[in-house]
Amino acid sequence: MAIRVYNTLTKQKEEFRPLREGEVRMYVCGPTVYDYTHLGHARTYIAFDVIRRYLEHRGYTVLMVMNFTDIDDKIIRRANETGEDPKELAEKFLRYFLEDMKALKVKPADIYPRVTEHIQDIIDFVRKLQEKGYAYEGNDGVYFEVRKFKDYGKLSGIKLEELVKGARVEPGEGKKNPEDFALWKKAKPGEPKWESPWGEGRPGWHIECSTMSTKYLGESFDIHGGGNDLIFPHHENEIAQSEACTGHEWVRYWLHTGFVMVSGEKMSKSLGNFVTIRELLQKYSPEVIRFFVLQKHYRSPLDYTEEGIQHAKNNLERLYNTLENIRVAMEKADVAFRWDEEEFELYETVREARKKFYDAMDDDFNTAEALKAVFEVSNAVNRYLTKVEKPKESVLRKALEFFKIVSEVFGLFEDYFKEQKAGDEEALIELLVSVRAELRKQRNFTLADKIRDELKALGIQLEDTPQGTIWKRISV
C-alpha cells in the first residue's frame, strides 16, 4: 500500500509522490523563541518527528529544515518587559527549545536556519517581489499587494472580499489596501535593525519562512508543516509570496496538526492555560509525553488532562511489562525443534498486527490506529506466556522484531533496545575473549594478537592477567 497523506491544500487524502525519487524534502515552521516550549508546540514537533521517522523507515532519504524566528514583535515586547537584550533573550529560549526537543527524543532537523543570519537572503527575496510588481514601498515598510496574487486563499479557503469587508488601513500605516501584509518593517526607535534598500529595518514574519525554505530546499519541495493556527495567515501568505516570486507551485503537500485543548479551549500562551515541557518532565518521562501525543491522530484535537496523561503512562507501562516478559522468557526459552498451535497463534497475531501497523501509518500517519496493533501483539504475547511451560525463542523474537519497528518509528522503548543491544555486544566480546584464550593455549599468537588489535580499534581493550583476560571500553 502506498503512503497517503491528507493535503490541506486540496482538502483530501492523496497518494504521496515526492518530487525526487527516494527523497523527501520537508520544512516545518519552528518556534518564535521568546518563552518556554509548551505541550501545544511539542505536539506539532513530535508529530512531524514521527512522520519523518516513518518516511525514513520506509526507505526515503529525508532532508528536514526547521527555522527559528529569532527577531519578531513578540521577542521585542518580551525583551522590553524583562530588560534583556532581544538577541540574548532569543538565544536563551532557542537553547531551551533544543534541550526540550532532545529530552523528548525529537530527532534534530538537518538545518535550523535563523532569521537573523539570513537578512540578506530575505532582502533579495523582497527585491524580486518588488521587481515583479507584487511588492511596494510604503512610509513604514514594504508590503505585499495581495490583490495581485490571483490564487490568494487557495490553502485556507479565505475569500479576498471577506478580508476586505469591514477592514481598513489604520492612520500612519503605509499599505495601499487593508489586506496587504508587511515584507519589511522600517526601523522604530530602540528596535533591532539592519540596512536595506528601503532604509534600516527588519523582516516581516511571513517572508522569513519563504526565504529560508526556498534557500535550503529549492523553489519546489514536498512537505510543509505546522500547526492548524498557521494555515491563515502565515501559510497562506507564504504561498502568495513564494509562488509570486517563482511563478510555479511551491509546496506539493501541506500537513497541519490539530490543537491541544484544555477544557474546550486551545492551549496557548495568550490564554495562560498552558503547561510547559519542563513542567511535564518533572512529573513524567519523555516517552510518556510522546505516547500521550501519539494516542491521537496528528490532525485531531488532543485534550490535555492530568487523567489523560496518567492513562498514557499506565498504557506505556503495560507495553514495557510485555517487553520485560519477553526478555525474561527468552533467557530460558527453548530452541524450536517444533512449533505447536500456541506458537502459530502468536506468529499469526504478530504477522497481522505488523500489516495493520503499516496500513495505519500509510493512511496519513495514523498513530492512533497503529497503536491498536501494538496492543494486540502485547496481549497475544502475554497470553502465550501464560499458556506454555516452555516458550519458543524464535516466535518471541518475531514479537520483539515488531516492537523494534515500533521503537524506530515512534521513538519509544529506545532505552530498552539500547540495553538489549549492549547485552548482545557484551556476549559477543566475551565469546571473542574465549576464542582468543583458546588460540593462546594452542600457541597461535598471530591470530590471538589480531583479535586483540581488532577489538582495540573498535574501542575494546584486552588485558591479560594471572586470573585471565579482562576487557574494558576505551575511547578511540
From Swiss-Prot:
A motif ('HIGH' region) lies at residues 31-41. It comes from the Archaea. Its EC number is 6.1.1.16. GO terms for biological process: cysteinyl-tRNA aminoacylation. Pfam families: DALR_2, tRNA-synt_1e. The keyword Membrane does not apply. The keyword Ribonucleoprotein does not apply. Keywords: Aminoacyl-tRNA synthetase, ATP-binding, Cytoplasm, Ligase, Metal-binding, Nucleotide-binding, Protein biosynthesis, Zinc. A motif ('KMSKS' region) lies at residues 266-270. Its main location: cytoplasm. It is found in: Cytoplasm. This is Cysteine--tRNA ligase. It comes from Thermococcus onnurineus (strain NA1). The gene is cysS.
